[in-house]
Structure formats: C-alpha cells, structure tokens
Curated annotation (Swiss-Prot):
UniProt: [4Fe-4S] cluster 2 binding residues: C94, C98, C101
Assigned protein family: Belongs to the radical SAM superfamily. Lipoyl synthase family.
Gene name tied to this protein: lipA
Ranges for domain Radical SAM core: 80-297
Pathway: Protein modification; protein lipoylation via endogenous pathway; protein N(6)-(lipoyl)lysine from octanoyl-[acyl-carrier-protein]: step 2/2
Protein name: Lipoyl synthase
GO molecular function terms noted in the UniProt entry: 4 iron, 4 sulfur cluster binding; lipoate synthase activity; metal ion binding
C-alpha cells in the first residue's frame, strides 16, 4: 500500500499527484478509450500576439494569476486578444481537488495583502471596462476568502470608477453567512457561482461540494442584493442526461438565478475525468431555448462557452456561442 502524499505548503500538485489525493477514485482518461473529437470541436487556435504577450507580462510583473492560464482554458488566446482576462485571486493553489479541473491542489500560503491594490492598478493599466474576478477554494481561511474579494472590488472601483465587476466565487463551504457578510458593502455587478454538473454526479465531479449548499449561496446573495444579477454555469459531457440538466435549470430559476452558461467539458489531461460525450451544437441550442422559456434573461450555450467567456458580452445580453 502506497504512502499518502505529504503536502508541503506552497507546492502545486497537478495531474496524477492531484488525482491520487481524491477520496473518490475515478477512472482517468488514460484508462478509458479516448473519444475522438467531432468536427465541431476542432478549432484553429489564434497565434500569439502582442496583446497576449502584454497581458501575460502584466500578470507576471504584478505576481497575478489568470484562471485562463491556470485552468488551461481553450479560449485563452481569443479572450486575451479581445482584451479581457479572468483574474484569479488568493493564489494559484486550491484546497479542493476536483478531478475535472486543471488548477493545482495543495496547501496554499497566506493571501497577499497587497494583491487588491496590485490588481486594481493592473486593470487600470490594461484599460479594461469589464473584469471577472475568481479564486481558488480557500477552505483554510475563516471566511473562505470573501473579505479579499470585497477588498479587490473596493480597490478596483477606486481606480476604475466606470468598470463593471463580475465575481465568480467558490462555495464558501461551512462559512456562507460569514462570507456574505464580508461582501455586503462591496458587492460585484454580477455574482457568479457555478453548479458545474447535475446533483447525481457531485460525488464524482465535485468531491467536497454540496448541490443544495451552492443553490442556497446563490439565493442568499440574491436576497441581500436583489438588484445584482446572479449567474451560474454547467459543463456538459460528464455523464449527465438532458433531463437532469433541465432539472438543474429549474432549480437555478427557483433560486433567483437569471444568467446561465452551458459548455462542453474537455479533459485537461489523461489524468482527469474522461469526456463521456461530445454534445452537438443543436442540443446546446435546444437547451438555450429551454433556459429562456424558464425565465433566464441571459443564456450563453455552446461547445466552447465557459463561465467567463466573453462575460462582458453576456452581461450586455449579446449572443455568445
């Protein structure tokens, strides 16, 4: 029997090392037949550009992280060329170990006190008008990192008064009330928390998370800030059924959520959860129609849609696929 990995603080555990720490054992992609990508999933990635290099340089200069890079998002080049980025605060090491995600797991170091000011200045230098702020899970912090989110919102607005801020938050497991209280005076313009998948698949896909808890987080925030839109996203292709997704959409609407993203799951490596199915574009279109019929005001649904993909256009209600 192999010895458990002794995690060192500040060390990133990825791929096989990360998967070995998950209490629920999943069959990695390397042990299953890898599905061939259909034609609609084959895109030509844009070449590097000065805009991409400038954004990466600004991140490195200020010791900031983007979820675009840390999670190996397939839309990185497109978004960076568009002049948008999703900043990941509170470090690049997550206390969770979800087998679909490429963000590193481990014991994170203490939050950087100057990060909110650095983030605000970087956004000012980049002349952004809409920004998405997300974070790793920080179960080691008493408020899950909520005060750090609030501090970032405050500092960003101080230097960028015309900006719109979307926050994509973790579930603040076990500390929801404390987290919501920390953010009450500095809420975002859009509050986003992803359910990710159907409740039947939570044990496999989101070990340590709870479906109802996530719904309650969205509802409680909406109750506190009725004028701030709430948003959530789901991945397709993890073994869910269409009927299960429709039920999740109904649950989201029952908890006040009006903005939705649906996209195709792609395995970051052979060590992650395998893709069970590639969902055809027509099915995404059908789910979008269902979402709008259920009362969602915004629904971005398509194979390459991600939670923060063209978030500025989503917030304006423009078509995003």
């Amino acid at each position: 029997m192999s010895k458990p990995i002794q995690m060192e603080k500040g060390v990133k555990y990825r791929d096989a090392d990360k998967m070995a720490l998950i209490p629920v054992k999943n069959m990695p992609t390397e042990q299953k037949e890898v599905l061939r990508k259909p034609e609609w999933m084959k895109i030509k990635l844009p070449a590097s550009s000065k805009r991409i290099d400038d954004i990466k340089s600004a991140m490195r200069k200020n010791n900031l992280h983007s979820v675009c890079e840390e999670a190996s998002c397939p839309n990185l080049a497109e978004c960076f060329n568009h002049g948008t980025a999703t900043f990941m605060i509170l470090g690049a090491i997550c206390t969770r170990r979800c087998p679909f995600c490429d963000v590193a797991h481990g014991r994170p170091v203490a939050p950087e006190a100057e990060e909110p000011k650095k983030l605000a200045k970087t956004i000012q230098d980049m002349k952004l008008k809409y920004v998405v702020i997300t974070s790793v899970d920080r179960d080691d912090l008493r408020d899950g990192g909520a005060q750090h989110f609030a501090d970032c919102n405050r500092e960003i607005r101080a230097l960028n008064p015309e900006i719109r801020i979307e926050t994509l938050v973790p579930d603040f497991r076990g500390r929801m009330d404390r987290a919501l209280e920390a953010m009450i005076d500095n809420p975002p313009d859009v509050f986003n928390h992803n359910l990710e998948t159907a409740p039947r698949l939570y044990r496999k896909v989101r070990p340590g998370a709870n479906y109802q808890w996530s719904l309650d987080l969205l509802k409680k925030f909406k109750d506190q800030h009725p004028n701030v839109p709430t948003k959530s996203g789901l991945m397709m292709g993890l073994g869910e059924t269409k009927e299960e997704i429709v039920e999740v959409l109904k649950d989201l609407r029952a908890h006040g959520v009006t903005m939705l993203t649906l996209g195709q799951y792609l395995a970051p490596s052979r060590h992650h959860l395998p893709v069970e199915r590639y969902v055809p574009p027509a099915e995404f279109d059908e789910l979008k129609e269902i979402a709008l019929e259920l009362g969602f005001t915004h629904a971005a649904c398509g194979p390459f849609v991600r939670s923060s993909y063209h978030a500025d256009l989503q917030a304006k209600g423009e078509e995003v696929k």
